[in-house]
Amino acid sequence: MFSLKLGKNKKKKKVPKGDSELFGSEASVDDKVSLTQYNYADEREKEKPKKRKIELATAESETIALKRAKNNIGDDSIVQELEALPEKVEDKEYEEMPVEEFGAAMLRGMGWTDENELEDSKSHSKKLPHEQIHPEGLGIGAKSQEMSNPVSVKDLVNDFMPVKKVPKQ
C-alpha cells in the first residue's frame, strides 16, 4: 500500500510589517491600500494547505474499498460481501466471452427482439421520418396546413383569383 501526500509548496515572501519602513513617513493613501492588500495576501499564504492522500493498491494487497470498509464500518456483513467479490479477472474469462455475440447480447439487454427486425424489414417500403417533406419555418414534428388538410384540384380552381393591375390615382 502506497500513499502520496499532496500539498502546496509555495515559498513565502517576507514584507516589512509597518508601512513607514517601506514608504517612509510620507506614504500616500494608494500606497497604504496596496500594502494592506499585499499583507492580506501574505496572511492567506501562511494558512496551511490541506493535505490530501491518494491511496494506491498493489496487485498483492487488498482493494482500497475493502480496506476502507474494514477501517470505517463496524458492520461485518458489508466486509463479507466485499470479500466474496472476485479480486482478479483471468485471461481465460475473457476468452470464454464470444466477441461476435456481444452486440446481439447488448441489443437484447436494451429490449431488442427478433420481432423488431422483422418489423423493420416491412417498414422499409414506407418513407423514413427524415425523408418526409419538412416545410421551411416549421419545427420538428409540426404539421403544416397543407399536410393536415389535403386540397383537391376543384378547391384550387374555385379559389383562383387573377392578379389585375390597378391604375394609381
From Swiss-Prot:
It is found in: Nucleus. Keywords: mRNA processing, mRNA splicing, Nucleus, Spliceosome. The keyword Translocase does not apply. Residues 1-28 are annotated as: Disordered. GO terms for biological process: mRNA splicing, via spliceosome. It comes from the Eukaryota. PANTHER family: G PATCH AND KOW-CONTAINING (PTHR15818), G-PATCH DOMAIN AND KOW MOTIFS-CONTAINING PROTEIN (PTHR15818:SF2). Associated with the spliceosome. This is Pre-mRNA-splicing factor SPP2.
